[in-house]
From Swiss-Prot:
Chief location bin: endoplasmic reticulum
Pfam families (UniProt xref): Mesd (PF10185)
Keyword Acyltransferase: no
InterPro entries: MESD
Entry-listed glycosylation sites: 192
Protein name, per record: LRP chaperone MESD
GO cellular component terms, semicolon-separated: endoplasmic reticulum; plasma membrane
Keyword Lyase: no
Region of interest called Escort domain, as start-end residue ranges on this chain: 156-195
Length: 224
């Protein structure tokens, strides 16, 4: 009995020593090139986050959360359904209004009278204020001494705003969707076109004078 106990103790000791001498499970995998397991990634302190980290974090949140359509970027928003029953085939602008609904749209506005950039700032600011009072959300950017950009968040109202702008005394021109609309203040070009016609009329003035001289010569002959 004592011998059997000693034999069991020796066997247990040998088994335990073999287990202790075995290498860890990942030891062989680490020795083979290209199959080494990467070390665990250390979490970055949020105080050290840069713009790229914040963008990735925001994308992760957007995937997990349901975002309302109004908060989505414009290119990710679904297009508004078009009611074809309200379209007027005789007015192409009505089709454009429907397709631009809920989309950002820009138009170029030219101020007449060769203004300075400061004058353009003041004049277009008055127009923007009038549109704001009429409940139109319009942003304005000066892009030249006589030119400004009017940007709308809802492009379906662009043609109504265009009609307002072209009726202003100092509006020379409005460019919208590649189409140029002359403004009330853009009449200087038409006046320049009419000047040569006036000059032609002046060139034709000598003709009636010649007829008067002929009449005088005829009256003298009658006297003789």
């Amino acid at each position: 009995m004592a011998a059997s106990r000693w034999l069991r103790a020796v066997l247990l000791f040998l088994c335990a020593s073999d287990l202790l001498l075995l290498p860890p499970p990942n030891a062989y995998a680490a020795d083979t090139p290209g199959e080494a397991t990467p070390p665990p990634r250390k979490k970055k302190d949020i105080r050290d986050y840069n713009d790229a980290d914040m963008a990735r974090l925001l994308e992760q949140w957007e995937k997990d959360d349901d975002i309302e359509e109004g908060d989505l970027p414009e290119h990710k928003r679904p297009s508004a359904p078009i009611d074809f029953s309200k379209l007027d085939p005789g007015k192409p602008e009505s089709i454009l209004k429907m397709t631009k609904k809920g989309k950002t749209l820009m138009m170029f506005v030219t101020v007449s009278g060769n203004p300075t950039e400061k004058e353009t700032e003041e004049i277009t600011s008055l127009w923007q204020g009038s549109l704001f009072n009429a409940n139109y959300d319009v942003q304005r950017f000066i892009v030249g001494s006589d030119r400004a950009i009017f940007m709308l968040r809802d492009g379906s109202y662009a043609w109504e705003i265009k009609d307002f702008l072209v009726s202003q005394d100092r509006c020379a021109e409005v460019t919208l969707e590649g189409q140029m609309y002359p403004g009330k203040g853009g009449g200087s070009k038409e006046k320049n076109k009419t000047k040569p016609e006036k000059a032609k009329k002046k060139e034709g003035d000598p003709k009636p004078r010649a007829s008067k001289e002929d009449n005088r010569a005829g009256s003298r002959r009658e006297d003789l």
